[in-house]
Design a protein with these regions (language model features):
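Flexible, glycine/small-residue-enriched loop-and-beta-strand segment within the central core
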Residues: 2-6, 10-11, 17, 23-27, ...
Length: 140
Protein backbone atom coordinates (compact mmCIF):
# COMPACT_ATOMS: atom_id res chain seq x y z
CA UNK A 1 0.00 0.00 0.00
CA UNK A 2 2.06 3.01 1.22
CA UNK A 3 1.35 4.86 -2.03
CA UNK A 4 1.51 8.31 -0.44
CA UNK A 5 0.05 10.92 -2.78
CA UNK A 6 1.66 14.18 -1.78
CA UNK A 7 2.88 17.37 -3.40
CA UNK A 8 6.50 17.19 -4.51
CA UNK A 9 7.58 19.74 -1.88
CA UNK A 10 6.58 17.33 0.94
CA UNK A 11 9.81 15.44 1.48
CA UNK A 12 10.18 14.93 5.22
CA UNK A 13 7.29 12.56 5.89
CA UNK A 14 7.86 9.43 7.99
CA UNK A 15 5.50 6.49 7.52
CA UNK A 16 6.34 3.33 9.47
CA UNK A 17 6.55 0.23 7.27
CA UNK A 18 3.59 -1.38 9.09
CA UNK A 19 1.31 1.62 8.42
CA UNK A 20 -1.13 1.55 5.48
CA UNK A 21 -1.74 4.68 3.39
CA UNK A 22 -4.54 4.45 0.82
CA UNK A 23 -4.65 6.33 -2.49
CA UNK A 24 -5.59 10.01 -2.71
CA UNK A 25 -4.07 10.94 0.65
CA UNK A 26 -2.14 14.16 1.27
CA UNK A 27 0.41 14.16 4.09
CA UNK A 28 2.12 17.39 5.11
CA UNK A 29 5.84 17.96 5.54
CA UNK A 30 7.32 16.79 8.84
CA UNK A 31 4.41 14.48 9.69
CA UNK A 32 5.07 11.09 11.29
CA UNK A 33 2.74 8.11 11.08
CA UNK A 34 3.61 5.23 13.39
CA UNK A 35 3.08 1.45 13.68
CA UNK A 36 -0.09 -0.24 12.42
CA UNK A 37 -1.92 2.98 11.57
CA UNK A 38 -4.20 3.25 8.53
CA UNK A 39 -5.02 6.43 6.60
CA UNK A 40 -8.00 5.92 4.29
CA UNK A 41 -8.62 7.61 0.95
CA UNK A 42 -9.40 11.28 0.39
CA UNK A 43 -7.84 12.30 3.68
CA UNK A 44 -5.59 15.29 4.25
CA UNK A 45 -3.10 15.51 7.13
CA UNK A 46 -1.31 18.80 7.67
CA UNK A 47 2.33 19.57 8.34
CA UNK A 48 4.15 18.55 11.55
CA UNK A 49 1.50 16.10 12.79
CA UNK A 50 2.26 13.06 14.91
CA UNK A 51 -0.04 10.08 14.33
CA UNK A 52 0.47 7.40 17.00
CA UNK A 53 0.23 3.63 16.81
CA UNK A 54 -2.95 1.80 15.79
CA UNK A 55 -4.72 4.96 14.58
CA UNK A 56 -7.37 4.89 11.84
CA UNK A 57 -8.10 8.10 9.93
CA UNK A 58 -10.74 8.54 7.25
CA UNK A 59 -12.04 8.33 4.72
CA UNK A 60 -12.70 11.98 3.83
CA UNK A 61 -11.11 13.50 6.94
CA UNK A 62 -9.22 16.80 7.23
CA UNK A 63 -6.54 17.20 9.89
CA UNK A 64 -4.80 20.55 10.29
CA UNK A 65 -1.17 21.38 11.00
CA UNK A 66 0.62 20.46 14.22
CA UNK A 67 -1.95 17.92 15.46
CA UNK A 68 -1.08 15.04 17.76
CA UNK A 69 -3.23 11.93 17.68
CA UNK A 70 -2.18 9.46 20.36
CA UNK A 71 -2.38 5.65 20.15
CA UNK A 72 -5.63 3.76 19.50
CA UNK A 73 -7.72 6.64 18.15
CA UNK A 74 -10.15 6.42 15.21
CA UNK A 75 -10.90 9.64 13.33
CA UNK A 76 -13.96 8.78 11.25
CA UNK A 77 -15.60 10.36 8.22
CA UNK A 78 -17.20 13.65 9.18
CA UNK A 79 -14.48 14.72 11.63
CA UNK A 80 -12.38 17.83 11.00
CA UNK A 81 -9.47 18.80 13.23
CA UNK A 82 -8.17 22.34 12.90
CA UNK A 83 -4.52 23.17 13.67
CA UNK A 84 -2.74 22.15 16.90
CA UNK A 85 -5.41 19.75 18.17
CA UNK A 86 -4.40 17.07 20.71
CA UNK A 87 -6.31 13.76 20.78
CA UNK A 88 -5.41 11.70 23.86
CA UNK A 89 -4.91 7.94 23.85
CA UNK A 90 -7.97 5.81 23.11
CA UNK A 91 -10.36 8.76 22.84
CA UNK A 92 -13.31 8.13 20.53
CA UNK A 93 -15.10 10.13 17.85
CA UNK A 94 -18.55 8.93 16.81
CA UNK A 95 -19.99 9.85 13.43
CA UNK A 96 -23.53 8.44 13.48
CA UNK A 97 -25.83 9.42 16.34
CA UNK A 98 -27.91 6.24 16.35
CA UNK A 99 -25.78 3.39 14.90
CA UNK A 100 -27.27 -0.04 14.23
CA UNK A 101 -25.51 -3.14 12.91
CA UNK A 102 -28.42 -4.23 10.72
CA UNK A 103 -29.17 -0.83 9.18
CA UNK A 104 -26.69 0.98 6.96
CA UNK A 105 -26.58 4.65 8.00
CA UNK A 106 -23.54 6.24 6.34
CA UNK A 107 -25.91 8.77 4.78
CA UNK A 108 -26.57 10.01 8.33
CA UNK A 109 -23.00 11.00 9.23
CA UNK A 110 -23.03 14.10 11.44
CA UNK A 111 -19.97 16.34 11.13
CA UNK A 112 -17.76 17.06 14.12
CA UNK A 113 -15.48 20.11 14.18
CA UNK A 114 -12.59 20.39 16.62
CA UNK A 115 -11.28 23.96 16.59
CA UNK A 116 -7.75 25.29 16.87
CA UNK A 117 -5.73 24.20 19.89
CA UNK A 118 -8.38 21.98 21.49
CA UNK A 119 -7.30 19.13 23.78
CA UNK A 120 -9.28 15.92 24.13
CA UNK A 121 -8.22 13.74 27.06
CA UNK A 122 -7.61 10.00 27.15
CA UNK A 123 -10.67 7.78 26.77
CA UNK A 124 -13.06 10.71 26.16
CA UNK A 125 -15.98 10.09 23.79
CA UNK A 126 -17.02 12.92 21.45
CA UNK A 127 -20.60 12.57 20.21
CA UNK A 128 -21.03 13.40 16.52
CA UNK A 129 -22.50 16.71 15.47
CA UNK A 130 -20.46 18.56 18.10
CA UNK A 131 -18.20 21.59 17.70
CA UNK A 132 -15.38 21.83 20.24
CA UNK A 133 -14.23 25.42 20.72
CA UNK A 134 -10.78 26.95 20.39
CA UNK A 135 -8.39 25.81 23.13
CA UNK A 136 -11.12 23.90 24.97
CA UNK A 137 -10.07 21.01 27.20
CA UNK A 138 -12.21 17.87 27.30
CA UNK A 139 -11.53 15.37 30.11
CA UNK A 140 -12.51 11.72 30.16
Amino acid sequence: MNSVKQPSNRENVFVHQSAAIDNHVIIGDGTKIWHFSHVLSHTSIGERCNIGQNVVIGPDVAIGRGCTIQNNVSVYKGVTLEDDVFCGPSMVFTNIYNPRAAIRKMDQVRPTLVKHGATIGANATIVCGTTLGRYCFIGA
